[in-house]
Amino acid sequence: PWIPGWYGISNIDYYSSDELWLKSNLKANERFPGIWFMPGFWAEYGMCTEPSAFGSPMVFSEDSLPYAERIRTDISQADSLPRPEVRYDGMLPFVISRLRNNCDKIRQAGCEIRFAVSRGPFNIASFLRGTTELMVALAVDPERSHKFLNRITGFVCDWLSWQKECFKSIDGVLVLDDLIGFLGEDEFREYAIPVFRKIFMCTGAKVRFLHNDADGLITARSLKEMGVNMFNFSHNHSMREIRDLAGEEPESYVHGAAGH
């Protein structure tokens, strides 16, 4: 999300132009040669990407990040939530097309498409329903909340698997979900661990990368159960604090998000 402003173009130009998207990402790689960008050449449309597949209206502006408007305010509507077709619905085909159209030039620059990327089920659910409505439903209507999250989880698995099928160079998944940082211990164990375990196991990817830069202490204690071996956490937590909670297994790599 920082690339358009850094490169000196509007958000709309960045998201709508393959040429400007590629040039700005190549420039970032050239300007910071010692940095590994993960995922690198991220083709996405802000918070619109996954919710758009469910039919959420999308809002784009010149100076702010795209966002999706909610479509399900009542948890009783959980059973009617559609299962998107990831090859055709919303902005998802545009993500795949952008990467396909530019993959040769990306490789010519010495880079590769390595990650399948998706927002996580709680993040997507918060855009479909509203954050407050989602959190209240988790507390007062667990049966329907499980159904709602499970439907979204199935979609996330489909979406990650489709990306991996389209680009054989992919051997990592990145899932971004700050909403799990708002869950208490009991809610995290009941709702988050099972769905994230399913998501991180669904593609067989070697690198299983989770981003949560809200409160991450409960998350850090649960990384192994979730199937995570790389964790991007809030700059409000120290590396030592997260490492102590995550454990010392050599396959678990953790690093903090930069402050804003």
Q: What do the PLM-derived regions correspond to, one by one?
A:
Residues 44-84:
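A contiguous, low-structure linker/loop signature
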Residues 1-60, 147, 193, 197-198, ...:
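N-terminal basic, low-complexity leaders that serve as flexible interaction/assembly modules and, when applicable
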